[in-house]
Amino acid sequence: MGARLSRRRLPADPSLALDALPPELLVQVLSHVPPRSLVTRCRPVCRAWRDIVDGPTVWLLQLARDRSAEGRALYAVAQRCLPSNEDKEEFPLCALARYCLRAPFGRNLIFNSCGEQGFRGWEVEHGGNGWAIEKNLTPVPGAPSQTCFVTSFEWCSKRQLVDLVMEGVWQELLDSAQIEICVADWWGARENCGCVYQLRVRLLDVYEKEVVKFSASPDPVLQWTERGCRQVSHVFTNFGKGIRYVSFEQYGRDVSSWVGHYGALVTHSSVRVRIRLS
């Protein structure tokens, strides 16, 4: 009979306990965890992990890994303009965590910009037969939905208030003079009826008091002259300290007083925040 081979069991490697790591090394490890998992999975583990997630270091390490021009500029500003302690009831998470979770830069901060969700997110005042939502007459480039809001024969208006801090931009960053706020709106008219359109965008402080304003009142579109949409845009720079809100306000009506919805069409409204590169 052949000899029976014996199998030797190798001793199992001892598992690595993360809580045994030195704090500075644990921060490095946790900084590689995606932001949402860091908050929802790691923060509840223990008090030590919670303190790390609630502190700035782990989030600054995440910002430092973005080597794009915008990422490097933001990291440099963030080191100089660290957020102060905030009201825990209003902001349970630290400001840097909120920034990494919300990723506000480059994202459109206007909710429901094309009416794809009805009038959700908008404060609406109806004139004439009120606002309506229709399909675009011509495609609008980059729009998330090819739909638009349409006004009537009397002035119609709607407004959306964007809370920049709740969207992830902390106050010290807004006050740094390194932030630009870019606003844009698409508007147009039907071919068979002229219209009037106005845009007003106001930067407000924490008490919703106006600090800076941009207004646009393009020439009315006349009947049988053109159809489709065109864009109005503006960039706020050097707007000073204390800005917290953006009030985005649109107004429109037709010029023929026709019953129905023949007034200004508005769509693809946007408010975007970006870092200055120079």
UniProtKB/Swiss-Prot annotation:
SMART domains: FBA (SM01198), FBOX (SM00256). GO terms for biological process: ERAD pathway; glycoprotein catabolic process; SCF-dependent proteasomal ubiquitin-dependent protein catabolic process. It comes from the Eukaryota. Keywords: Ubl conjugation pathway. The keyword Nucleotide-binding does not apply. PROSITE patterns: FBA, FBOX. Expressed in heart, skeletal muscle, liver and kidney. Expressed at lower levels in spleen and brain. One of its GO terms (cellular component) is SCF ubiquitin ligase complex. Residues 99-275 form the FBA domain. InterPro entries: F-box-assoc_dom, F-box-like_dom_sf, F-box_dom, F-box_only, Galactose-bd-like_sf. Coiled coil: none annotated. Residues 15-62 form the F-box domain. Substrate-recognition component of the SCF (SKP1-CUL1-F-box protein)-type E3 ubiquitin ligase complex. Able to recognize and bind denatured glycoproteins, which are modified with complex-type oligosaccharides. Also recognizes sulfated glycans. Does not bind high-mannose glycoproteins. Part of a SCF (SKP1-cullin-F-box) protein ligase complex. Interacts with SKP1 and CUL1. This is F-box only protein 17. It comes from Homo sapiens (Human). The lineage of its organism: Eukaryota, Metazoa, Chordata, Craniata, Vertebrata.
